[in-house]
Amino acid sequence: MMAAKVVPMPPKPKQSFILRVPPDSKLGQDLLRDATNGPKTIHQLVLEHFLTFLPKPSLVQPSQKVKETLVIMKDVSSSLQNRVHPRPLVKLLPKGVQKEQETVSLYLKANPEELVVFEDLNVFHCQEECVSLDPTQQLTSEKEDDSSVGEMMLLAVNGSNPEGEDPEREPVENEDYREKSSDDDEMDSSLVSQQPPDNQEKERLNTSIPQKRKMRNLLVTIENDTPLEELSKYVDISIIALTRNRRTRRWYTCPLCGKQFNESSYLISHQRTHTGEKPYDCNHCGKSFNHKTNLNKHERIHTGEKPYSCSQCGKNFRQNSHRSRHEGIHIREKIFKCPECGKTFPKNEEFVLHLQSHEAERPYGCKKCGRRFGRLSNCTRHEKTHSACKTRKQK
């Protein structure tokens, strides 16, 4: 018997993040000009440009859904793994990290038709979804390793490599560029930049992009676990306060029972149940209450105010709960109403028993239509009407 052949599953593509910058934009030129200053300068430069896209704190409400250019792209490599990125202009490798594990690169695509523009993605996130800051991270040291910055922002797509190619190298088109790439891999520095071979290529990048597919926005991705101290170096604290996630909401815990509240006023009101404090007194009878709402309900007894009225009959009530209970009676009346006597019932069981009582009161029923009568004479008189109708139809 032939043994079953086990076929190994192909490895899943690594999830990465991407930053696409128009080559003719100011950020693209600054990245090429300041590339020799190291990876930290590039991160700082990107975040400074991201800061210019954010609205002013005075013009933004914390609860408003704002579309920002900060977009989280968790599955970029799975959707773009088959695309080819020719001519990588800037290649960034962090020091002390293996190339196949931590590769941070910037690709300025030479082919405008291969550009994946912001309109094609159609992914928008509000400020609360863009940057989430864990409150436990606010106590981290400012001397945190710079590797968190490298993990925070990836400027390339680390997709699957073609067969037969070195995973540490990117595809090239000519021999001159292949020689430059091999020299770059041998250098110990963390940053190597190359320029396009001619000016025609640069002009084509700037002029041949279709108008409908022009990249208008800067896409930056930042991990949710970015430390607050690290992010505050580039972004204003007031803006960070606007972009905090719901998970950073402070909870106020009662020390006696452990119950939590999201507002301090709720905690203070709750603690009065433990202490027995009643700071609200009635001006008419002097009775004390621990909540202001309970005092308002009590004062309506003295004033006779009934602000809640029934929408069916117009009856007024002092409390909204009393009105709701009363309106339920009208609803049940419409459902369980006897067609014989017009009596209403709050429950279906009572309504069925009432209908059976009508049947017991009328033991004589017509064999033709099923109508019931309390007396036999009335039933026989009714049955004659059916026989009279038949004789008329026969004539």
UniProtKB/Swiss-Prot annotation:
<keyword id="KW-0805">Transcription regulation</keyword>
<dbReference type="InterPro" id="IPR013087">
    <property type="entry name" value="Znf_C2H2_type"/>
</dbReference>
<keyword id="KW-0804">Transcription</keyword>
<feature type="zinc finger region" description="C2H2-type 2">
    <location>
        <begin position="280"/>
        <end position="302"/>
    </location>
</feature>
<dbReference type="Pfam" id="PF00096">
    <property type="entry name" value="zf-C2H2"/>
</dbReference>
<keyword id="KW-0539">Nucleus</keyword>
<feature type="zinc finger region" description="C2H2-type 5">
    <location>
        <begin position="364"/>
        <end position="386"/>
    </location>
</feature>
<keyword id="KW-0479">Metal-binding</keyword>
<comment type="subunit">
    <text>Interacts (via C-terminus) with PRMT3 (via zinc-finger); the interaction is direct and required to localize protein arginine N-methyltransferase PRMT3 to the nucleus and inhibit its proteasomal degradation.</text>
</comment>
<keyword id="KW-0862">Zinc</keyword>
<dbReference type="InterPro" id="IPR036236">
    <property type="entry name" value="Znf_C2H2_sf"/>
</dbReference>
<dbReference type="GO" id="GO:0005634">
    <property type="term" value="C:nucleus"/>
</dbReference>
<dbReference type="GO" id="GO:0034504">
    <property type="term" value="P:protein localization to nucleus"/>
</dbReference>
<feature type="region of interest" description="Interaction with PRMT3">
    <location>
        <begin position="246"/>
        <end position="395"/>
    </location>
</feature>
<dbReference type="GO" id="GO:0008270">
    <property type="term" value="F:zinc ion binding"/>
</dbReference>
<keyword id="KW-0677">Repeat</keyword>
<keyword id="KW-0863">Zinc-finger</keyword>
<feature type="zinc finger region" description="C2H2-type 3">
    <location>
        <begin position="308"/>
        <end position="330"/>
    </location>
</feature>
<feature type="compositionally biased region" description="Basic and acidic residues">
    <location>
        <begin position="169"/>
        <end position="181"/>
    </location>
</feature>
<feature type="zinc finger region" description="C2H2-type 1">
    <location>
        <begin position="252"/>
        <end position="274"/>
    </location>
</feature>
<feature type="zinc finger region" description="C2H2-type 4">
    <location>
        <begin position="336"/>
        <end position="358"/>
    </location>
</feature>
<feature type="region of interest" description="Disordered">
    <location>
        <begin position="157"/>
        <end position="208"/>
    </location>
</feature>
<comment type="function">
    <text>Localizes protein arginine N-methyltransferase PRMT3 to the nucleus.</text>
</comment>
<protein>
    <recommendedName>
        <fullName>Zinc finger protein 200</fullName>
    </recommendedName>
</protein>
